[in-house]
Amino acid sequence: MKIVDLAAMEYAEAFALQERLAADVAAGRAEETLLLLEHPPVYTLGRRGDGGSLPDPSVRPVEINRGGDVTWHGPGQLVGYPILDLGCRGRDLHRYLRFLEQVLMDAAASLGVQAWRVAGRTGIWTEGGKLASIGVGVRRWVTMHGFALNICNDLAPFSRIHPCGIVGCPVTTLSREAGRAITVAEAKAAVAAPFAGLPADALPEQPRDAVQPSSCDDVHAPSTTSRRPPCPLTV
């Protein structure tokens, strides 16, 4: 698999590149590719979004063909677009989403931050809030779009939306959770490694103990701490 570091790129340009690569991978003209980059500030709205997650009427998101609701991209946030052929990996979109979550949890752990899944949600969380968002699209079983991992970005833009359609859910960054400055370059290295070693015909099995129960009222890790859980699951 090819890992391509694009540094910074406008959203429309990156989307056009994804479309070209996805078509080429589906036709056997190109190898699978992971695009890693940052975007200038932009809001995007996936297929699940209906405007209810946009309490600020001045927000004008780019409507795109990925799953999920509304989110924000900007400097200091690592965006990853894997262009993968799921046709030779079991055609299991659910397993692919869990694979992306595991990659991000492992990357966060390597940088000193514990993160976890929440049943019924897609993405990863910490005690401080949502750390990464995931939204994908598939054409001819080739993936597009992917994940956005908050590293050291400004969190103020998230206050103008209900991130991923979740009302009242705080958003956090790796740097905030680690209590130190983490760079996008550090995160790129941690995220890229699992893709570089990905088998051509399978997705790894995912552990089951990283998922918190869907019946919980909050997305927080089990612990003895008395801190107030940060993120009510209200939609």
Curated annotation (Swiss-Prot):
Record EC number: 2.3.1.181
Residue(s) at site: Lowers pKa of active site Cys: 130
Entry's transmembrane regions: none
The protein's annotated pathway: Protein modification; protein lipoylation via endogenous pathway; protein N(6)-(lipoyl)lysine from octanoyl-[acyl-carrier-protein]: step 1/2
Entry GO terms, CC: cytoplasm
Note: In the reaction, the free carboxyl group of octanoic acid is attached via an amide linkage to the epsilon-amino group of a specific lysine residue of lipoyl domains of lipoate-dependent enzymes.
Family of the protein in this entry: Belongs to the LipB family.
Protein name: Octanoyltransferase
